[in-house]
């Protein structure tokens, strides 16, 4: 069953409050991001933790424990995953985790952004871009690099709805506009 946004937010808020109360915000940022990434192909995992009888339910909960406990995920996060399995709501896990992740980042005054480039950026390049954009938006910025071959060259950064476009494509379009006026 797909949950309403308000219910997803309630789950995320409950986990956020635990993270703050237990002083686990930094740990949760890392762990929640890892969970989001590991559950990106959630359909297969969702099938593993679905059940139709009591024994399958116990097996599904055991799968959660055996999958995440060895990686030392926080017990509150593991228990939340178990609750979602028990209530057959695991399909909503990534949405809940994404809402939680956003709350955690907001709490730490960190914003997420995307840097588009024609090829994968090095850690040094990404770090330099983060620093420059952080100064522009007055917040710590975390960037994900996505490949966009339509840029021709250069980069385009999207943070908080703001676009910083240094791509050759954008420069050509600006030149085209100038020539047409």
UniProtKB/Swiss-Prot annotation:
Keywords: ATP synthesis, Cell membrane, CF(1), Hydrogen ion transport, Ion transport, Membrane, Transport
One of the record's GO molecular function terms: proton-transporting ATP synthase activity, rotational mechanism
The keyword Cell membrane appears for this protein: yes
Membrane topology, from the record: Peripheral membrane protein
Locations listed in the record: Cell membrane
Disulfide cysteine pairs (residue numbers): none
Pfam families to which the protein is assigned, alphabetical: OSCP (PF00213)
GO cellular component: plasma membrane; proton-transporting ATP synthase complex
Quaternary data: F-type ATPases have 2 components, F(1) - the catalytic core - and F(0) - the membrane proton channel. F(1) has five subunits: alpha(3), beta(3), gamma(1), delta(1), epsilon(1). F(0) has three main subunits: a(1), b(2) and c(10-14). The alpha and beta chains form an alternating ring which encloses part of the gamma chain. F(1) is attached to F(0) by a central stalk formed by the gamma and epsilon chains, while a peripheral stalk is formed by the delta and b chains.
Family: Belongs to the ATPase delta chain family.
Biological function: F(1)F(0) ATP synthase produces ATP from ADP in the presence of a proton or sodium gradient. F-type ATPases consist of two structural domains, F(1) containing the extramembraneous catalytic core and F(0) containing the membrane proton channel, linked together by a central stalk and a peripheral stalk. During catalysis, ATP synthesis in the catalytic domain of F(1) is coupled via a rotary mechanism of the central stalk subunits to proton translocation. This protein is part of the stalk that links CF(0) to CF(1). It either transmits conformational changes from CF(0) to CF(1) or is implicated in proton conduction.
PANTHER family linked: ATP SYNTHASE DELTA CHAIN
Protein name: ATP synthase subunit delta
Provenance organism: Mycoplasma capricolum subsp. capricolum (strain California kid / ATCC 27343 / NCTC 10154)
Lineage: Bacteria, Bacillati, Mycoplasmatota, Mollicutes, Mycoplasmataceae
